[in-house]
């Protein structure tokens, strides 16, 4: 991977994605058994996280990834910075570039914010900090798609040829968009199951099959990715009630029994237990939710490695 930024799952070729997944596994193995989880891979590098939306898993995993690689990790939030005084995102970005950031990791409510950040911070000689999109509005979340693909590969042996059913609020989901792109790149078959009101315009042009019947899709699924209903992004009523949504599109124990024994259940979090997924299903052996969280750290280590170091595999095992 020779790119300086990771803004979209579409930035990744099949070889790029496979190399990142392979290196994520290498980082996991390099850290196994270490009492002190520290590698010198990014010693002397400065990583700044810019989170303008709430986050637990993504923010923590990027911070842990940077620290396990010995980078200096600095957090900037809207409430704790000059953004609260009216400073623009552009001025904040230029300030952080001038301060010597090697990488900027951004989550922002506006779609396209990461692309803008990359354009604003490029220097005259083409240099500048690497920008990683940690979620921009309803647009993209490429590292989530990578960790989901890694989880599928670890549990099922490969991504290619697997049937992945993505269920729920596709309309407002950056996770769904990035997963559709990356899973298609890696050779998976993707099925979207959603109420018609929660499907985006133009979905017929995506490399997916669309279904409105969850029960019909579960028996042939290798993996089921449940999406949270993003009520905070909704201005109107997209379904009659939470109960009605759960009855038609929630993954209950009864529906789980329709899955093949080998199938896995994924969720990007945060989960709304009792709505899109039941308590027992979320905690069942088929659930890979906590494995996704662990993989998030190693995938983000691999992404930082590819953007800031390059192809020196020996740097992983130091």
Swiss-Prot record:
Its EC number is 2.1.3.2. One of its GO terms (molecular function) is aspartate carbamoyltransferase activity. It comes from the Bacteria. PROSITE patterns: CARBAMOYLTRANSFERASE. It is an enzyme of class 2 (transferase). Pathway: Pyrimidine metabolism; UMP biosynthesis via de novo pathway; (S)-dihydroorotate from bicarbonate: step 2/3. Carbamoyl phosphate binds at residues 57-58, 107, 141, 144, 269-270. GO terms for cellular component: cytosol. GO terms for biological process: 'de novo' pyrimidine nucleobase biosynthetic process; 'de novo' UMP biosynthetic process; amino acid metabolic process. Keywords: Pyrimidine biosynthesis, Transferase. InterPro entries: Asp/Orn_carbamoyltranf_P-bd, Asp/Orn_carbamoylTrfase, Asp/Orn_carbamoylTrfase_sf, Asp_carbamoyltransf, Asp_carbamoyltransf_Asp/Orn-bd. Catalyzes the condensation of carbamoyl phosphate and aspartate to form carbamoyl aspartate and inorganic phosphate, the committed step in the de novo pyrimidine nucleotide biosynthesis pathway. Belongs to the aspartate/ornithine carbamoyltransferase superfamily. ATCase family. This is Aspartate carbamoyltransferase catalytic subunit. It comes from Mycolicibacterium smegmatis (strain ATCC 700084 / mc(2)155). The gene is pyrB.
């Amino acid at each position: 991977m020779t790119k300086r930024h990771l803004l979209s799952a579409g930035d990744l070729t099949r070889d790029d994605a496979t190399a990142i997944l392979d290196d994520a596994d290498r980082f996991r193995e390099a850290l196994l058994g270490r009492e002190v989880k520290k590698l010198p891979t990014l010693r002397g590098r400065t990583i700044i996280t810019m989170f303008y939306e709430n986050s637990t898993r993504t923010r923590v995993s990027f911070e842990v990834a940077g620290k396990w690689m010995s980078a200096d990790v600095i957090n900037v939030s809207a409430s704790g910075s000059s953004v609260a005084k009216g400073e623009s995102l552009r001025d904040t970005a230029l300030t952080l570039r001038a301060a010597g950031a090697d990488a900027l990791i951004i989550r922002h409510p506006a779609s396209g914010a990461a692309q803008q950040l990359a354009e604003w911070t490029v220097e005259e000689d083409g240099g500048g900090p690497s920008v990683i999109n940690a979620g921009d509005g309803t647009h993209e979340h490429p590292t989530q798609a990578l960790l989901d693909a890694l989880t599928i590969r670890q549990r099922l042996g490969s991504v290619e040829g697997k049937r992945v059913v993505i269920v729920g609020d596709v309309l407002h989901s950056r996770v769904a968009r990035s997963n559709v792109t990356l899973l298609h790149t890696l050779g998976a078959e993707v099925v979207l199951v959603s109420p018609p009101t929660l499907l985006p315009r133009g979905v017929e042009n995506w490399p997916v099959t669309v279904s409105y019947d969850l029960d019909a899709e579960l028996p042939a699924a290798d993996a089921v990715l449940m999406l949270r209903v993003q009520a905070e992004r909704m201005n109107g009523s997209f379904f009659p009630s939470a109960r009605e949504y759960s009855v038609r599109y929630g993954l209950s124990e009864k529906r789980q029994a329709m899955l093949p024994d080998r199938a896995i259940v994924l969720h990007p979090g945060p989960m709304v237990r009792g709505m899109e997924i039941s308590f027992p299903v979320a905690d069942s052996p088929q659930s890979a939710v906590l494995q996704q969280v662990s993989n998030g750290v190693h995938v983000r280590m691999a992404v930082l490695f590819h953007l800031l170091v390059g192809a020196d595999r020996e740097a992983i095992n130091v």
